[in-house]
From Swiss-Prot:
It catalyses: GTP + H2O = GDP + phosphate + H(+). Composed of three domains: the N-terminal N domain, which is responsible for interactions with the ribosome, the central G domain, which binds GTP, and the C-terminal M domain, which binds the RNA and the signal sequence of the RNC. It comes from Mycoplasma pneumoniae (strain ATCC 29342 / M129 / Subtype 1). InterPro entries: AAA+_ATPase (IPR003593), P-loop_NTPase (IPR027417), Signal_recog_part_SRP54_M_sf (IPR036891), Signal_recog_particl_SRP54_hlx (IPR013822), Signal_recog_particle_SRP54_M (IPR004125), SRP (IPR004780), SRP/SRP_N (IPR036225), SRP54 (IPR022941). Part of the signal recognition particle protein translocation system, which is composed of SRP and FtsY. This is Signal recognition particle protein. GO terms for biological process: SRP-dependent cotranslational protein targeting to membrane. GO terms for molecular function: 7S RNA binding; ATP hydrolysis activity; GTP binding; GTPase activity. Belongs to the GTP-binding SRP family. SRP54 subfamily.
Amino acid sequence: MFKSMISSIVMRSMQKKINAQTISETDVQAVLKEIRIALLDADVNLLVVKNFIKAIREQTVGQTVEPGQDLQKWLLKVIKQELINILSQPNQEITSKRPLKVMVVGLQGSGKTTTCGKLAVWLKKQFQQKAMLVALDIYRPAAIDQLATLAEQTESVFFAKGTQAPDQTTKEAVKTFKESGCQAIICDTAGRLQTNQELMDELVAIKNELHPDEILMVVDGLSGQEIINVAKEFHNRLKLTGFIITKLDSDARAGAALSLTSLLEVPIKLMGTSEKLTGLEQFHPERIASRILGLGDVMTLVEKAEEVFDKQSLTKTVSKMFLGKMDLEDLLLYMEQMNQMGSVSSIVKMLPGNLTVSDDHVESIEAKVKLWKVLINSMTREERRHPKLINRDPSRKQRIIKGSGRKMDELNKLMKEWSKLQTKTAEMGRMLKGGKNPFSGFGGLGGLGF
């Protein structure tokens, strides 16, 4: 769905000058038709699409146009607000009630168990609260082992009772939870199909023992239209409080998954953005609307950077860059910190449309970063801090090649590009001092040699 780039449709369809003071049905007909096709291609539910197009038509047809008004920007603003309306529901955030009791449900293979681990990490990061993970999937022994591993990785308390009836295990877990000192209990239920009434009854029994504050359904972003009927059944039996949509970092169309919130009037509370345990984020309708329109998501990008980059060390690194004194150890630290923000592709998706990078270029950047890290990690600290030592001594190059398992021309290319980077960043520093734009005339991502 993020690939639909509705903004390009608007720009392409609104090229002709509208001379009349009032916008007519004919003026917006072409753009609405293309938007409808784009949304359906993204697997958005037909009813949601119809309501969306109707709302846009009602807000545009008959509206008075001010002389000189930018119609593209005006129409994009209307479209963005309607997207926000579709994606928004009351109680969008995880409840602030503590202690917090969460029941996680969903279809088989939707990623519930992994999401439970991610949720524990998210709660710890956002609220400094420790969680208890409860294994209730007695039909898949590997699920219990997986949750135990996740509990260890996330420093959470783990609770399981083997193949004991899940509702009885829940009852015992709640008692232990009250005495554990944990602020949240997260129950991982067995994956099931909506047609299996016996297992659905089991969920109801678990709910009656847990009395959860949140009942969250995990939905795969790759799901098709069938997920809507599935979610309706879960909601009818359990009264869901929210959805967690996974794989929104991929090229998944995600239209069906995102349609759920409008059709069921249940908020999307969290979204999966990577396979890492840290890859769970709060769902912000306005930010997702911006991504869908190709306007980027700068706020999330800034938040990620603030989490990863230490202000003092970043200031030091940037100062060295603009003085032309950035060494390979600085470059390695920079690449590792960028990696903590997410993959190159996930970062690129947050950039506004006019700053986007092609998929081929993204793959090229990711491959180059991986190669550079291998080569730099094969150097001594002295070599990283004084890269010119490598160029002066062929034996150092031979040792680095042998240790990294890479080719000599790859190392030579790294050294050449590092030298270019030194020159570029020093020039950028001089431009800054002169009050000029340091990024004009430089290619790649920020002109950093990529």
